[in-house]
Amino acid sequence: MKLLYFAWVRERVGVESETRDIPTNVTTVGALKTWLASIDEGYAYAFETPDIIRVALDKTLAEDDAQLAGAGEAAFFPPMTGG
């Protein structure tokens, strides 16, 4: 799966994008955040408060219970403000 990181999430993980093989037991957005947090210290720092990180699957906003099946891309970004 292609993974994209934006803003401070990108700064903390240290890469803009990457492609990773996702374990078969990681089936939801929430599980993906948890798995990514286990990779190393940078990922753990980026995902230390996973509930505030927004995720888009194939450019569509997704909640933590969204299924990953069929998705080719996940983008991670901090909350946005308008104005």
Task: For every predicted segment, state its role.
Residues M1-G82:
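Ubiquitin-like/PB1-type beta-grasp interaction modules and other compact soluble beta-rich domains
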